[in-house]
């Protein structure tokens, strides 16, 4: 079986960390050799960019600046970690990927699809996740969960309307792409785990 690229996506408080732990357990049960990455981040430079883009600053950060920082971090991760791992036969399990930029910067910030497509093409060079599990949650519920974890970062402090637009774009993109599987994260954790496991089982059954 060729190495696969699996991504977990969702708004703040959707339960991505728990979902990733479940995926790790599933992959281990299948004796799959895989690595974990997160976006933005995953390399020393990309982690510095993560800190930079999430922090509060004394000046306003332009939407385009935020977008370019995200893609700069993604470029480092692709070049230094993801592409080499896949080439060496390892699977990749990612906490966020390009879909986050399409949803947050495209839907939330209103940056044009053409701009996003241009950056995506330059950085990804055609590489696309084999499976994306999108954890769909009501932004109000998700942000309440996120607040329970501690202080919110710069992006997490955006108005609820920002997250509503982001969610709408996530749902639109998931509806148009068969490789994106939507899981209702408003359910109990037991039901969410069941649905994620079913997605993974179906995905594996379809592989050769």
Swiss-Prot record:
- KW NAD (keyword) present: no
Using the UniProt record, name the top-level EC class of this enzyme in a single word.
transferase
Taxonomic superkingdom: Bacteria
| Keyword entries, A-Z | ATP-binding, Kinase, Nucleotide biosynthesis, Nucleotide-binding, Transferase
Q: What is the reaction catalyzed?
A: dTMP + ATP = dTDP + ADP
The EC number(s) given in the record are 2.7.4.9
* Chain's role: Phosphorylation of dTMP to form dTDP in both de novo and salvage pathways of dTTP synthesis.
Listed name of the protein = Thymidylate kinase
């Amino acid at each position: 079986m060729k190495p696969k690229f699996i991504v977990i996506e969702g708004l703040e408080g959707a339960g991505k960390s728990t979902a990733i732990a479940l995926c790790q357990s599933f992959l281990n049960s299948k004796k799959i050799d895989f690595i974990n990455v997160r976006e933005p981040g995953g390399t020393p430079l990309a982690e510095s960019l993560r800190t930079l883009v999430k922090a509060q600053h004394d000046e306003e950060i332009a939407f385009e600046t935020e977008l370019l920082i995200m893609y700069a971090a993604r470029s480092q991760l692709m070049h230094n970690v993801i592409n080499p791992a896949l080439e060496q036969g390892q699977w990749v399990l990612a906490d966020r990927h390009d879909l986050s930029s399409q949803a947050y910067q495209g839907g939330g910030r209103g940056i044009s699809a053409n701009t996003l497509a241009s950056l995506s093409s330059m950085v990804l060079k055609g590489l696309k996740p084999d499976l994306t599990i999108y954890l769909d949650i009501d932004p109000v519920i998700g942000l309440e969960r996120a607040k329970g974890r501690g202080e919110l970062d710069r992006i997490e402090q955006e108005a609820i309307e920002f997250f509503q637009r982001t969610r709408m774009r996530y749902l639109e993109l998931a509806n148009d792409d068969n490789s994106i599987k939507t899981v209702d994260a408003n359910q109990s954790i037991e039901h969410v785990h069941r649905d994620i496991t079913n997605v993974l089982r179906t995905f594996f059954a379809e592989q050769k």
